[in-house]
């Protein structure tokens, strides 16, 4: 009865941090299906409870429960001392957070959209990312910058940009790009516990998607190591490397390609800085073909970096076809729905590129 009650809460989308914690406790012997939103909420709850130095700061994160309800129930549970609402001023949010981190606290700085992290980029890169190096290792800046990254639905140019490649470019930060619930939970908890800056690039569409959470991942001490990709779908004919919501696009494409007898290996990067190139390289050596999939623009993108590394490595000699990329179109994001769809990678785009790489019709 208790199990059924918990599952009803999950199905109805009424799970608060407290309810999810109770569900995990009661169903510890089995796998849970929860949304990415709830996985992040539970991870925040557990880390704030675990360490008195951890606090959440951002716009509408407290009394409103967060713009995407990631912080639902946390202000009521922990109060103003741990959950800080701020004015709409990303520069001040980032600067205050970096100062707090330099003075012994462990802030989780939420940007309602990573598009507006650019308002605080000086603090993120010049202060947080460089302090450890500039101090010859004497200073640590234990801070998490997190928020919705990339396109959602109908939010146009100024809320749709994918900043993965921007932050991947910068030394001094770790950059994680979760896909499913275990990614979101394990990487966020690892980020909070890290002694230097971590940028968590989440996806708004994924927030509402449900994924299984294994008994192991339900543990309050579950963390995922940085720089460890996951083979989301094993295969032998071609390697598809992707991240965040691009993994979902790639998996749908792989299902379609399987109908034609093409067996795709789909790699979920999970983290782009550090990048698990070894997993990519081993897969390319096995399949002898590579396609990358990302939502960001093509110039200087994640796929371009992976392509360069494969070309510069001994995996290049194993390739039986060109390295091809599926990316967002090189334009500011349109608002009109048909144009927005056309500007983003779709499963059909991946199918087409895989067949081109394999030289099949």
From Swiss-Prot:
Family matches, as Pfam families: Transket_pyr (PF02779), Transketolase_C (PF02780)
Predominant localisation class: mitochondrion
Binding site for thiamine diphosphate: 90
Catalytic activity, reaction form: N(6)-[(R)-lipoyl]-L-lysyl-[protein] + pyruvate + H(+) = N(6)-[(R)-S(8)-acetyldihydrolipoyl]-L-lysyl-[protein] + CO2
GO molecular function term, any single one: pyruvate dehydrogenase (acetyl-transferring) activity
Cystine bridges: none
SMART domains found in the cross-reference section: Transket_pyr
EC class of the enzyme, as a word: oxidoreductase
GO biological process, any: tricarboxylic acid cycle
CDD domains: TPP_PYR_E1-PDHc-beta_like (cd07036)
SUPFAM superfamilies: Thiamin diphosphate-binding fold (THDP-binding), TK C-terminal domain-like
GO cellular component: mitochondrial matrix
Cofactor(s) of this protein: thiamine diphosphate
Presequence positions on this chain: 1-27
InterPro entries registered for this protein in UniProt: PDHB_mito-type (IPR027110), THDP-binding (IPR029061), Transketo_C/PFOR_II (IPR009014), Transketolase-like_Pyr-bd (IPR005475), Transketolase_C (IPR033248)
Positions with a binding annotation for K(+): 143, 191-192, 194, 196
Compartments, record wording: Mitochondrion matrix
UniProt EC number: 1.2.4.1
Role summary: The pyruvate dehydrogenase complex catalyzes the overall conversion of pyruvate to acetyl-CoA and CO(2), and thereby links the glycolytic pathway to the tricarboxylic cycle.
NCBIfam families (alphabetical): PRK09212.1, PRK11892.1
UniProt-recorded name of the protein: Pyruvate dehydrogenase E1 component subunit beta, mitochondrial
């Amino acid at each position: 009865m208790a199990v059924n009650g918990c599952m009803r809460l999950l199905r109805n989308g009424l799970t608060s941090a407290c309810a999810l914690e109770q569900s995990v406790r009661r169903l510890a012997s089995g796998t849970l299906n929860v949304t990415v939103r709830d996985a992040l909420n539970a991870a925040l709850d557990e880390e704030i409870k675990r360490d008195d130095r951890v606090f959440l700061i951002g716009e509408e994160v407290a009394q409103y429960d967060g713009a995407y309800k990631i912080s639902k129930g946390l202000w009521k549970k922990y109060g103003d001392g741990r959950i800080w609402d701020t004015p709409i001023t990303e520069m001040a949010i980032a600067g205050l957070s970096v100062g707090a981190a330099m003075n012994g606290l462990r802030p989780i700085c939420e940007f309602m959209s990573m598009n507006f992290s650019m308002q605080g980029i000086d603090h993120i890169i010049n202060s947080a990312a460089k302090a450890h190096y500039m101090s010859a290792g004497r200073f640590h800046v234990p801070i998490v910058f997190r928020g919705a990254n990339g396109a959602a639905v109908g939010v146009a140019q100024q809320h749709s940009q994918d900043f993965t490649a921007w932050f991947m470019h910068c030394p001094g930060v770790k950059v994680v790009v979760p896909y499913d619930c275990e990614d979101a939970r394990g990487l966020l908890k690892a980020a909070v516990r890290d002694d230097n800056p971590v940028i968590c690039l989440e996806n708004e569409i994924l927030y509402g998607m449900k994924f299984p959470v294994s008994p192991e991942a339900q543990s309050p001490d579950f963390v995922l190591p940085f720089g460890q990709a996951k083979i989301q779908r094993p295969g032998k004919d071609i390697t598809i490397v992707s991240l965040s919501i691009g993994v979902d696009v790639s998996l749908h494409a792989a299902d379609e390609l399987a109908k034609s007898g093409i067996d795709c290996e789909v790699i979920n990067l999970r983290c782009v800085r550090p990048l698990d190139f070894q997993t990519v390289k081993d897969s390319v050596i096995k399949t002898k073909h590579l396609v990358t999939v990302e939502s960001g623009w093509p110039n200087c993108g994640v796929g371009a970096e992976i392509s360069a590394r494969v070309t510069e490595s001994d995996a290049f000699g194993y390739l039986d076809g060109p390295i091809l990329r599926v990316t967002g179109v090189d334009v500011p994001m349109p608002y009109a729905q048909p144009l927005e769809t056309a500007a983003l990678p779709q499963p059909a785009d991946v199918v087409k590129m895989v067949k081109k790489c394999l030289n099949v019709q």
